[in-house]
Amino acid sequence: MRILNKLQAEASALVITMIVIFIAVACIGTAVHVTTTTARQTDSSRDFSTLRSAAEGALDFAYGIWVEKVNTTFGPVSNKTLNDALVTVPSFAATNGVSVSYDASAGYSGPQITGIDLAQYGQAYGPLTANSNPPSTKVPLIDNTGRNKFPGWLGMNTSYLASVKMSATFLGNRTVKYGVKRAINYTTVPLFQATAFFEDDMELYRPAPMTIDGLVHTNGKASVSQGSAGGGSGGGLTFTGNLSYVTGYLDSTAPYPADDPVWRQTHSPTTDWWSGYVANAAFPPNYPAGFDQQVTEVTRMEPLGVDAATILSATPPPYNITTNHNSDSARELIEPPNTYVDPITHVITSTNSFPDTQAIADRRVYNKAGIRIRISKTGTTTTYTVTTANGATLTAAQKTALTNALSQTSMYDRREATNVDVTSFDLSAALSTLNASTAKFNGILYIDDISSTGYADPKAIRLVNGSTLPSNGFTVGSENPIYIQGDYNTSGARVPSAVFADAVTILSNAWKDSNSSGALSARNANDTTVNTAIVCGFVPSEWVNPVTHETYGYSGGLNNFPRFLEDWSSNTFTYKGSMIELFASGIATGQWDTGSVYHPPNRAWSFDSNFIDNPPPGSLTAVTVSRGAFVRF
């Protein structure tokens, strides 16, 4: 019995030992399998990542080619243009004996970009041909996350699809393929859909009570604060639309220099040159829908359609000392290609020795104009030269009618502190000629006076009797300052209108040249309405006058973008339009001040919503380009 029990015990032990060995072997096998599988998965993941990086890199290359083409074409481009540009494609060096190539079996010899027919979005367009540009549609401006990139803004969007498919054979003869695509968009954004667009810092330092509706954007810093003019926290500044900024937002009472360390080196942080300054006080404007809903930090809008740094070689006057005077600043938009303003003497200098880039040439108001009037003077003799371009034709009698609408006078500009020789253009006298069907006028008039002898001899253009404008729209451009006297574009239905100038000053219906040099009490304004877009220069805060070397104070802000010279007390300046600041003034560089210069009007300002679908002739557009997320296919 003892022997039997012993044998049974030994047998049980053997069985247990065998079971343990079996389990151990099984575990080892499982571990080997898991390790092998994990290694294969790691290899596969690494291989996949390599292929994905190559594919996404190829698409980034294609995107760079696309950006170059749209920026040099200044608009959407055809499939053929892109295909020709993508003949040379990036190649990928072998890594660890593994080569990555384009998947020829799927039709890819490199990355591809094709225009998207918007029919897939529910709009009926015909098939795209190789040489046709993709169609455009009006869209809100969104970023690649689907969020509104510039809240409230609309653009004309042209979409493309960039795609590539790549293949590679890795160790173990494993073939891996990867396809990726993304949408890319070229969107033109009319600038005349904003109440105000500033290329530089936009300031509104505690203005008299005012409400600004519509969109407001600055490519610089937005410095806005409310309060009654000159001090106190009364009054109000209200934005009813969206305000967007690029480099910063500030709502203190020291809008420009308070956070500027350079300024602090030469100024006291507890004093300021603005009347009523209160150190470290903040008076934020009113935002009816809430700050978070109305104020947005955004990326730049390019007002020239491309990156300005690629075509403009210098900062605005007084620093435009580059060898090529045809690329000094965005002020080129209001200058003819053969003149420039000397930043020291203010003389309009004629020259044909500087080249014009296509990007600038296409945007000059002078180049767009159908009728051009040049004023020159020798002694007491004034000569008017009228020429046509862009399809316009004028008879000798019509040219005479236009010159008869011009007259010479002089007035004192209290802000400039000097007499100004003014050429007045009587629109009522010129209207029948500008409206004549035989003239084939495109609605853009360019007029300039190049006879200034220097800083103390400024010349300007004045628009008078402009309540009725040419029926198909009217844009006036000049490299001189422009005065708008009296009601403008107010008779009957408003027409799309714009004024491009070195500076724009509003003179009321009550203005008299004979009182221009008198005290402020002799320059009483009355209610006046102006309906036009304004594109002009500005004198920024802390600007250094290159002639006097004086450092200026506050710019006067957005509320003084159109300038004033009268006592507007209890009178209203009604304005409907769009205000665009792109450059520093080169001629009208007098320092902003109230005092004896003017007393502010009641401001009833609003955006002209007609501009959205019917902008003025020669309108400007900004451009944004964007990319969607990578999508595997």
Residue ranges and their predicted role:
Residues 71-163, 170-174, 189-633:
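C-terminal globular interaction/adhesion domains in large, modular proteins
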Residues 166-169, 181-183:
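Long amphipathic alpha-helical scaffold segments
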Residues 175-189:
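A short, surface-exposed beta-strand/turn
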Residues 40-72, 218:
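Membrane-proximal N-terminal amphipathic helix
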Residues 2-5, 15-54:
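Aliphatic-rich helix starts adjacent to a transmembrane/signal segment
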Residues 22, 31, 35, 59-70, ...:
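A generic secondary-structure signal for well-formed alpha-helical elements
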